[in-house]
């Protein structure tokens, strides 16, 4: 839920519900790590809406959250007013997946958050060339916690790596284009980082071809993922919210 920390101040007047998916943040870890999949996580989101007595919502999905949003559009389209996909599409580039597997589920090799922030800043300087260190320092606090015995700790169940590896090995990848097509009949915005290694320009064009009314925005000097407080991101989000209010 901390992924939306930079966006939240720009959505005054809107009710914001930012959930920690199972096994992340302050949510409990699942007994069965195979439940870390987009269908189960989407069901969790619907159960949260039920608990809050919310009939329909506009969903903003960043990265994996966007995959969950696509799944929801097929499983529970009646619950969605519209959607924003942040740097994710039905074709996920292998280069980006490989980069994610370099760190997912692993204990970060840093002594403290300051060292971690410097490493993150150095690692993202090509894809995010104009982002000041202070932003990366804040982003680091969203991503990790100080560990009690020193060093830093991830804020999610390390077995997420096992779930992702198992799904890939078993060939359980969903037909994401079929899921994406579930968004055809509702307002949709898609945001892409110009330097993204997960959402290619070619996939972005295909998305527009299949959803001609989609609000499509490319954010300069951003990789995976835009922070969502960039002017281009905010313009797309507010335009979408105008359609769903």
Regions found by a protein language model. Give the residues of each.
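Conserved HGGG/HGGXW glycine-rich cap/lid loop of the alpha/beta-hydrolase fold
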Residues: 1-29
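Conserved catalytic-core motifs of eukaryotic protein kinase domains, centered on the activation segment
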Residues: 4-5, 27-33, 95-96, 201, ...
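Short beta-to-alpha linker loops that shape the active-site pocket of alpha/beta-hydrolase fold enzymes
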Residues: 17-24, 89, 220-223
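Conserved acidic catalytic loop of the alpha/beta-hydrolase fold
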Residues: 39-57
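Conserved hydrolase catalytic core segment
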Residues: 55-96
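Conserved alpha/beta-hydrolase catalytic His-Asp/Glu region
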Residues: 111-166
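Conserved serine/cysteine hydrolase catalytic core
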Residues: 145-209, 218
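Catalytic histidine-centered segment of alpha/beta-hydrolase-like enzymes
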Residues: 219-231
């Amino acid at each position: 839920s901390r992924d939306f920390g930079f966006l939240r101040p720009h959505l005054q007047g809107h009710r914001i519900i930012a959930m920690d998916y199972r096994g992340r943040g302050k949510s409990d870890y699942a007994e069965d790590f195979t439940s870390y999949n987009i269908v189960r996580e989407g069901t969790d989101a619907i159960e949260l809406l039920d608990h809050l007595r919310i009939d329909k919502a506009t969903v903003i999905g960043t990265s994996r959250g966007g995959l969950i949003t696509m799944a929801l559009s097929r499983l529970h389209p009646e619950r969605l007013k519209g959607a924003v996909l942040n740097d994710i599409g039905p074709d996920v580039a292998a280069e980006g997946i490989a980069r994610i597997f370099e760190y997912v589920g692993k204990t970060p090799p840093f002594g403290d958050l300051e060292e971690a922030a410097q490493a993150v800043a150095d690692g993202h300087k090509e894809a995010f060339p104009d982002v000041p260190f202070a932003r990366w320092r804040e982003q680091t606090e969203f991503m990790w916690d100080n560990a009690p015995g020193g060093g830093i700790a991830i804020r999610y169940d390390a077995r997420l790596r096992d779930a992702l590896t198992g799904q890939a090995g078993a060939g359980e990848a969903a037909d994401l284009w079929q899921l994406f097509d579930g968004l055809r009949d509702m307002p949709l915005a898609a945001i892409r980082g110009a330097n993204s290694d997960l959402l290619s320009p070619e996939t972005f064009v295909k998305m527009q071809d299949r959803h001609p009314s989609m609000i499509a925005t490319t954010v300069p000097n951003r990789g995976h993922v835009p922070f969502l407080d960039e002017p281009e991101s905010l313009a797309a989000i507010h335009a979408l919210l105008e359609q769903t209010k």
